[in-house]
Amino acid sequence: MDTIHRAEDAKEPAIQGYGLINEPVVPELSNVNETVGQCQRLMQRCTDEIRRYDRNHIVFVEHVAAVKDMSTGENLWNKYPIDELWFLIDDDNAVYEAHFYTPAVFTHQSAGDSVEYPKPCYVDNYLEYWVGCMSARQTSQDTYYESDYFTAGEDYNLYAPVLHSSKLGSGTALFDDVTVTEYAPDGTSGVVWHNDFSDGSQKPENAWNSDGTGSWSMSEGYLKISGGTDDYVLTFDKLKLREGCKYKISGHMQTVGAPSGGFADIRADFSLAENVYESGREYVFAELSEIVRFGKENNVPIYFGEFGADAESFKNGLGGERWVADVMDFCNENGISYSYHAYHEPMFGFYPEDTVKYPQHRNEALAKVFADKNRNG
């Protein structure tokens, strides 16, 4: 209340307005309207109380960030599409706030994750995560396997290189030089994905096992799957199946010490998605457009109160500065105000030191983006 009085008296001109609730998480009720309605009513009550003392300053109203499953206590961050999580309040000096950290696997990576931006492909709204697969078959060369052609179909428009083993027991499967070749309608061809596992930089996006056994590693120029009493599956990047093109997946593979019935294979797994983007910038722009559509439809201002990428994403050429530049380009081109998260903190900071220290060593790649994108600001 003291802050409200001081802002109303204009004694603290740095106060732009009041952020009501940061990233609100609400209990999940019987439907999304009831769930979001809880947050809307609370935000309205907060605003009404503020307006008893201050009618001049902005109130910043953030959409529902997540819903809590009350039976498990789990916060569900992606259960509902963004356009179902917005709401309006009755106030003529409100700004509607969103935060942006998409793709989270990039912006929130840990040391060693090595997630790059951009990737070859981004997916929005899976319709069928797994439709089927095609395995490479052994050729006349002892350890070399190659699949038949596969193409885009009505049931799938994506594929992912996959390494699979089953019932290895105490044995090991070795994989090397896994390659996807694209054959264009004009007769030309080229490699669109390759992994020789020499430096460990291209890691699987997902590791799955059916019974909790098995493990994988990269060493000596191989990817190795070891042990496992049932299926063990490593899935790499999702890639778009381009219309009119044909594809083959190939690579070297052998099993060592596997019991009878144990085997491994190289394959392509197929998925169906509503939207597939082959440009990181195109993907980011599409995701941001979904967020700001609420403002355009309701003629209210949108503000990105937070966006940022952690310190790891700026190392070793992973592309943190490219992601920030794309977000800032969208905001600048669409007249959206924004705040970068954060100024001074170890994980996301423009000055990424411990906050007990005076900020000295800034993120120079980030500083250059700020200077370039705000040169005319």
Regions found by a protein language model. Give the residues of each.
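Extracellular glycoside hydrolase catalytic/binding regions
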Residues: 9-14, 24-133, 141, 269-334, ...
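Short, solvent-exposed turn/loop segments enriched in Gly/Ser/Thr/Pro and often Arg
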Residues: 21-22, 63-65, 340-347
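Residue-level detector of anion-binding/catalytic polar loops
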Residues: 246, 301, 337
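Active-site beta->alpha N-cap acidic-glycine motif
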Residues: 1-3, 46
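Short, solvent-exposed loop/turn elements at domain surfaces
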Residues: 104-108, 202-207, 348-349
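Aromatic-rich peripheral "rim/lid" segments of glycoside hydrolase catalytic domains that contact
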Residues: 132-133, 179, 216, 272, ...
